[in-house]
Amino acid sequence: MNATTEMESPLVFTDSAASKVKSLIDEEGNPDLKLRVFVSGGGCSGFQYGFTFDEAQNADDTVMVKNGVTLLVDSMSFQYLVGAEIDYSEGLEGAQFVIKNPNATTTCGCGSSFSA
């Protein structure tokens, strides 16, 4: 199933994150790039988040479009990300993409690892 959503999505893709992704895609000079967010086993808490650019959209991907930027999440990762917010933050600790996930029962200090 391939779902494309602009509003009322079970995921929140913030303006800040979309803006940063757009600038990174512009730097690469490849308008076909999409941001893929995924969950994999590992990290200090059992699961970890990953971000990568991808040109391919798979049949089972959940697709969100925000401000002209496409976000892809595979079906396995999606179940761990329902209700999550994907944001981009700049602060004293540096600039980074951040996932605020209500499904995470514990998170690691690194911010990229969690357990569900």
UniProtKB/Swiss-Prot annotation:
Residues annotated for iron-sulfur cluster binding in this entry: C44, C108, C110
Keywords annotated in UniProt: Iron, Iron-sulfur, Metal-binding
Biological process terms in GO annotation: iron-sulfur cluster assembly
Cofactor: iron-sulfur cluster
NCBIfam families registered for this protein in UniProt: iron-sulfur cluster assembly accessory protein, PRK13623.1
Described function: Required for insertion of 4Fe-4S clusters.
Identification of the protein by name: Putative iron-sulfur cluster insertion protein ErpA
Name of encoding gene: erpA
